[in-house]
Amino acid sequence: MASEPLDLTSRDQRSLDSDEAIPLEPCTVVAFIGRTERGPLDEPVAIKGFDHYRRVFGGHCSFSFVSFAVEHFFLHGGETAVVVRVANRAGRALLEVPAGAGVLKLEAREPGGREFLRVSVDYDRVEQQPDRFNLVVQRLGRPSSQLVDDQELFEGVSMNPAAERFVVDALNESELVRLVGPPPLARPDATRSARPGEPIPYLAATVPGTDGEELTDYDVIGSNTEGTGIFALDRCEQVDLLCIPSPPGRDLGSTSFVAATRYCERRRALLVWDPPWSWSSPSAALLGIRTSARASRCALTYFPRVRPRGDVGRYEEGMPASGVVAGLLARRDRRGAWHELPGEESSLKGNLVPAIEVDAPHALALQRAGVNAFVRTEPGVVTFQGDVSLAGPGCAEGWWRRLGVVRLTSFVLRSIEHYTRWVFAAERPEELVIDLERQVWIFLARLQERAALAGSAPDQGFFVRATPRTDSSGVAITLRVGFAAERPNEFLTYDFRFREPTMTTEIVAVAGAERRLG
C-alpha cells in the first residue's frame, strides 16, 4: 500500500539545482476518484494503461463509470493516471479454514463483491513438523472459474509465535487476505482430494464481499487527517487534472464540487466536472448553466455526454466524457499547456459519439456561457470545442474564463514552485538571488519564444525580481514573477515566498503589484 508520496515525475527533486532547466512539456497526471470493482481503498495507484487498470481495479461494472473514464482517457492521448478507489460500507469476503477444534479466519484485504477468493492447505515437505503448513490463496476472475487472476503461496508457515514464519507475520505480507482475530492453536486441516490423483480442492469464501451503497459526497471528499477520498491525492507528488465521474443516473452534490475545486486550487490542478443528467438537450444545458450556482476557475464542464456508436439502448442517456476531455488535454499538454489541439486531434475516438447532437449555434451559445461542447464538424468527425473554464459570469477578471489562461497559469506556478526547491539547499548562498532570477527568467523567455506569453520583447511578456529577506514569518527570500498571458504588459503577478523553517514555498497573488519588491 502506498504510504509515501507517489512520485510520478522522471527526476528526483533532490538532484535539482539552479542550472536545471524548467521543462516546457511535462507529463500530465490525471487523477480519477470513484467506485471500482475491486482494488485498494483510499490509496493512489499510478496506472499506465487500461490493461494495467483492469489488473488492479477490475473491469467495467454497472454501478460506476470510473473504468470507462480511465479507458477513454488512454484512448484519447493520456499517458499517466492515478486512481483512488472509494466506497460506502463495502464488505470484505470471509474465509474460514478448519483447524482441528478451531478455525483459521481470513478476510479479503480489500472489500468488494468482486473479490472471489479461495484457499487450499497442504503439508508437502512439512509432514513431520506438526505446527507447519503450506497455504495457497487465489483470486478468481469469477465464481467457480478456473481462471486465476492472482495467486499467493505461503510455504512452511508456522503456528508457533517464536518461529520465523509465524502465520501472523507471514500473512502481513499478503496483498489478498489478512488474518481475523487470533490464530487457532492447531494448524489448519489439509484440504485433501477425495481420491488419489484428483486436484487439491479449494475452500471458497463462507461470507461473500459486498460492493456497498451509493457514494455520498463525503465518501468522495474523504478526510484530510486520515488521507482518504480526495485527500489521498496528497500522497501524489503531482496532480494536474481531477476527474470524479458521476455515477449512473445520479449527480454528485454541490459539496463534492466545492471541496474538489478548493483542493484543485491548492494543488494548481483543474477539475473536469461532468454535466448534470438533467441536461437532456442543448436548451436544457443552457438553462442549467445559467441558473447554476457552481462556478470556479479551477473547473471546466462540457456537453453532451458520449455513448458507443449504435448502442443507444444500453446507454440511452450516455456516459460521462470526463475521461475523454482529460485525455485530450493531456495530449495537448505534450505541445504545451497553452496550445490548442487541431480539430483532427481533438476528435472523439474509439467508436464514441455524442449522446445528443449539438449544432454550431447552440455550441457557440454554450461556450459563451462557460460550457465546452462536442460538435460534429463533418460526417463521422466530432471535435471538442470551447476552451472555456467554469469561472462563470460573476468572475470579475474575464481572462479566467479562458481555459488556456487558467492552465498556463497553473503550469507556470507549479513549475516554478517545483523546480526552485533547490533554494532550500543552495550551495552558493551568496549567488542565490542571481541564480534564482536567471533560472526563472530563462524559463519564461522560452515560454515567450513558444508564443505562450504575449509581447514581442521580454519586458512586454514577463518580469522576474528576487529579494532576500528575513522576517518573523521565516521568509528567507521572495521571488516576484509577472507574466502576460493575454496582452503585452498586462501581468498576472505572484510572489513566491520561500520559508526556511518549513522548507515550503508559499505562492501569493499580488494585485496591481509593482515590478520591484518594496
Question: Model-flagged regions — what are they?
Answer:
Residues M1-G34, G58-H76, A101-T225, V258, ...:
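Small/polar, repeat-rich beta-turn/loop motifs that tile beta-strand-dominated architectures
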Residues M1-G112, Q138-G141, F231-G518:
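Structured, hydrophobic secondary-structure cores that serve as assembly/anchoring elements
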